[in-house]
Swiss-Prot record:
This is Pentatricopeptide repeat-containing protein At4g19440, chloroplastic. Keywords: Chloroplast, Plastid, Repeat, Transit peptide. InterPro entries: Pentatricopeptide_rpt (IPR002885), TPR-like_helical_dom_sf (IPR011990). It comes from Arabidopsis thaliana. It comes from the Eukaryota. Residues 1-32 form a transit peptide. Disulfide bonds: none annotated. One of its GO terms (cellular component) is chloroplast. It holds the Pfam family PPR_1. Coiled coil: none annotated. NCBIfam families: PPR. PPR repeats lie at residues 238-268, 272-306, 307-341, 342-376, 377-411, 412-446, 447-481, 482-516, 517-551, 552-586, 587-621, 622-656, 657-691, 692-726, 727-761, 762-796.
Length: 838
């Protein structure tokens, strides 16, 4: 009854009994009165179904006989045929027709009068019905329209309809198939009786071509899905369209699928030279050159003559596999078939030969192509330059560049970028910088790789000003150097004292909107803390958190280490608390930094207490943390406690390393307990831990201090037998020992040996030698060494002068030192005396 509310003229003449007498078809047509009516009265469909299936009502309701329904269909058929056969669309007639039409009725009737349809009028009808009335045509109806448009040579219109259909931009009557792509192909195939073979081929051509060209990202896969559907229904696309499909697959690097599709194509059409060439290209690019050569032979056996492109494809494939002899055979075969090699042929050969480092053959081909009237173009020269760069022949690449310029060819951005890559690989920072400047001045596009390579090279050569200038050029072009390069640059700037530049660069990146990663920020924090610029480091830490950037454990460890280095333990422990609050668990390195900081402040008890607290909080001490505790105790002259930590370490099965042993050995040597030190050295050897240079330094120095110099000399020789070369500290310890014993001849021997081994004396070496000669009464040699020391830029300290004067005092007083002294000695004595009394 709700229908009567929408049709007052009908309702005035009809009663409910009339409404009940409507057939299902009448109700369906009535429901098409308007789109609004259809939506509001969805419930009628259900009630109508129930109404007409009720056994009681089936006996009461009047049903029209078949002749009435046939008459109604004939009338609708005539109206549709009349509207769609006109030269232009009658809007009013169309509107009236749509109100009484269902999609299924149109789908059933449309093929019957297709021969009378004007394709343009039908297109307008479809547009009006779908766009203005949301009329849902079936897929078959759309495909029939596409076929009619193609039959009328209205290819563009047919293409637009198909694209809108694929994109889902038109309402479509739902079909049973889940995959709409297959459904469209299936609908086209179902119209085989409606069109001749040519139109069916055009339809399949259009579908494949639209998928491949309109949907570039995954269109070839869509086309590949529908291709078997069409092929199995006998709707084979043309050879041209098949080639479009195969080419699309090659461009998508789907070489195997291309070869499989080629096999399907061969079942429906006889491949021509283009199809064969595309398949050969797929085999070559897929690394199946042998299959490509076989297909080439099969092509010739089939009577299909290869063209220049076919030969070039095979030659390129053979070249990529290093089979250049066969490639040259195919080149000769080209000539035998009456085809001259082209510029592309020669370019392929030159590029492949240079990459294979067959430079002589490459030059031979280059000369041949010039003789044949194919002067190399920019692409050929660029390939040559690139190949030489890859082969490590930078000089040859530069020669080719010069030859290119002499032939009147201009360098391209590709040429510049390739040469820059070559200069960077060879570490030629000046040339790389010059070329990059030249590129920028010309206005060429510089790729990110060139910028990055040059900036990295400049940083390694400490040319930071140039590096920063190029970073500025990158930022002007909204190019980010990347986290790795930025980290390297900031680390380099900080390492060489350019902290203000590093700070400026860091802020510049943030203000430009680029994301600065945690590793880069950590590099800046490390540089500032290492330089003692804690205020700047604290400011950066606040900026990081204020901008919502991330701080990790490394960030906090860096700040804690910086605070401990400047003896700001309160701030260090404050960062520890903040670190924990942010959910970052301190690691052993964190604890070790703080323990070391406490020891450096002579807070030994606090360090031991903190160690115990850390263990209670879950710290599992490792060799590094034990090393810090042992070193701290030993430096605080609490060697016994250091030994206790060593014993605890062994009981916990934490294996000590050379550094741990060295801490204890050095402490025992300083306190004169050589037996304990030597015992530890034997323990090291027993455990397979080799003593290092520092181990022998402590032992030799310890022996020399207590005048056991000959034993120290034996350790010195033992060290050499272990493969360790003595350094200035070992020589100095022995010289000091012999000097105190007055054995200056042995001192001189050691000094000569130092010179022969290119080991240069340091301040301590000179001091102990001066003291030895002064005590021995050799004032002249002591003065000479003092002057030599100054000449080498080593500044004497108070200990040096003390040793110098002490020798004179031992010989009879300072006044005696002046007797018989020349001007140089006199000045040295006066200066030494002044230093002592200051």
């Amino acid at each position: 009854m709700a229908a009567l509310l929408y049709f007052p003229k009908i309702s005035s003449q009809m009663t409910s009994s009339h409404f009940i007498s409507f057939s299902p078809m009448d109700l369906r047509r009535l429901s098409r009165a308007s789109y609004l009516f259809t939506r509001r009265l969805k419930f009628i469909a259900k009630s109508r179904k129930c109404f007409h299936t009720s056994r009681y009502l089936q006996q009461c309701v009047h049903r029209p006989d078949k002749s009435e329904e046939t008459s109604s269909d004939r009338h609708l058929h005539e109206r549709l045929s009349s509207v769609l056969s006109k030269r232009s669309l009658d809007y009013e007639q169309c509107k009236q027709l749509i109100t009484v039409l269902s999609p299924l009725e149109f789908d059933r009737l449309f093929p019957e009068f297709r021969s009378k349809v004007n394709p343009k009028t039908a297109l307008d009808f479809f547009r009006l019905a779908s766009d203005s009335f949301s009329f849902s045509f079936s897929l078959r109806s759309y495909c029939l329209l596409i076929g009619l448009l193609l039959d009328a040579n209205l290819l563009s219109a047919a293409r637009v309809v198909l694209i809108r259909l694929i994109n889902g931009n038109v309402p479509v009557l739902p079909c049973g198939l889940r995959d709409s792509r297959v459904a469209i192909a299936d609908a086209m195939a179902s119209l085989s009786l409606c069109f001749d073979e040519e139109i069916r081929r055009k339809m399949s051509d259009l579908l494949i071509e639209v998928y491949c060209t309109q949907f570039k990202r995954d269109g070839c896969y869509l086309a590949l899905d529908v291709f078997p559907v069409l092929a199995n229904k006998g709707m084979f696309p043309s050879k041209t369209t098949c080639n479009i499909l195969l080419t699309s697959l090659v461009r998508a690097n789907e070489f195997q699928k291309c070869c499989e599709a080629f096999d399907v194509v061969c079942k429906g059409v006889s491949p021509d030279v283009y199809l064969f060439t595309t398949a050969i290209n797929a085999f070559c690019k897929g690394g199946k050159v042998e299959e490509a050569v076989k297909l080439f032979s099969k092509m010739e056996e089939a009577g299909v003559a290869p063209n220049v492109v076919t030969f070039n494809t095979v030659i390129d494939g053979l070249g990529m596999c290093g089979r250049y002899d066969e490639a040259f055979m195919f080149k000769e075969k080209m000539v035998e078939r009456g085809m001259e090699p082209t510029l592309i042929t020669y370019s392929i050969l030159v590029k492949g030969l240079t990459r294979a480092k067959r430079i002589g053959d490459a030059y031979f081909v280059l000369k041949e192509m010039t003789k044949k009237g194919f002067p190399p173009n920019v692409i050929v020269y660029n390939n040559l330059i690139d190949s030489f760069i890859e082969a490590g022949s930078l000089n040859k690449a530069i020669e080719i560049k010069d030859l290119m310029v002499s032939k009147g060819l201009s360098l391209t951005s590709s040429t510049y970028n390739t040469l820059i890559k070559g200069y960077c690989k060879n570490g030629q920072a000046d040339n790389a910088e010059r070329l990059l400047k030249e590129m920028l001045s010309i206005g060429f596009n510089v790729n990110q790789g060139s910028f990055t390579s040059v900036i990295c090279l400049l940083c390694s050569h400490l040319m930071f000003d140039s590096a920063l200038r190029f970073v500025g050029e990158m930022l002007l072009r909204n190019m980010s150097p990347g986290g790795g390069l930025l980290t390297t640059l900031i680390s380099g700037l900080c390492k060489h004292g350019k902290h203000s530049k590093a700070l400026e660069l860091w802020f510049q990146f943030l203000n430009k909107g680029f994301v600065v990663d945690t590793r880069t920020s950590n590099a800046l924090l490390h540089g500032l803390c290492e330089a003692g610029k804690l205020d700047e480091a604290f400011r950066i830490q606040k900026e990081i958190l204020g901008r919502g950037c991330v701080m990790d454990r490394v960030s906090y460890n860096t700040l804690i280490s910086g605070c401990c280095g400047k003896k700001k333990l309160d701030e260090a422990f404050m960062f520890l608390d903040e670190m924990v609050k942010r959910g970052l668990k301190p690691d052993n390195y964190t604890y070790s930094i703080l323990i070391c900081g406490l020891f450096n402040m002579n807070k030994v008890e606090e360090a031991i207490q903190f160690w115990d607290d850390c263990k209670r909080n879950g710290m599992l001490p490792d060799v590094y943390t034990y090393s810090v505790m042992i070193d701290g105790c030993c430096k605080a002259e609490r060697t016994e406690e250091g030994q206790e930590f060593f014993d605890e370490m062994m009981s916990k099965n934490v294996q000590p390393n050379t550094v741990v042993y060295n801490h204890l050995i050095r402490a025992y040597c300083r306190s004169g307990r050589l037996s304990m030190a030597l015992e530890l050295r034997e323990d090291m050897k027993h455990k397979g831990i080799s003593p290092n240079s520092a181990t022998y330094t402590s032992l030799i120095k310890g022996m020399s201090i207590i005048s056991r110099v000959e034993e120290a000399k034996l350790l010195f020789e033992e060290m050499r037998m272990e493969g360790l070369e003595p350094n200035v500290f070992h020589y100095t310890a022995l010289i000091d020992g012999y000097g105190k014993l007055g054995q200056m001849v042995k001192v001189e021997c050691l000094l000569r040996e130092m010179h022969s081994k290119n080991v240069h004396p340091n301040k301590i070496t000179y001091t102990v030698m001066i003291g030895g000669y002064a005590r021995d009464g050799n004032v002249t040699e002591a003065s000479r060494l003092l002057n030599e020391m100054r000449e080498k830029g080593i500044v004497p300290d108070s200990i040096t002068y003390k040793e110098f004067i002490y020798g004179y005092l031992k010989q009879g007083g300072v006044l005696e030192a002046f007797k018989g002294s020349d001007e140089e000695n006199y000045a040295a004595i006066i200066e030494g005396w002044n230093k002592l009394i200051q």
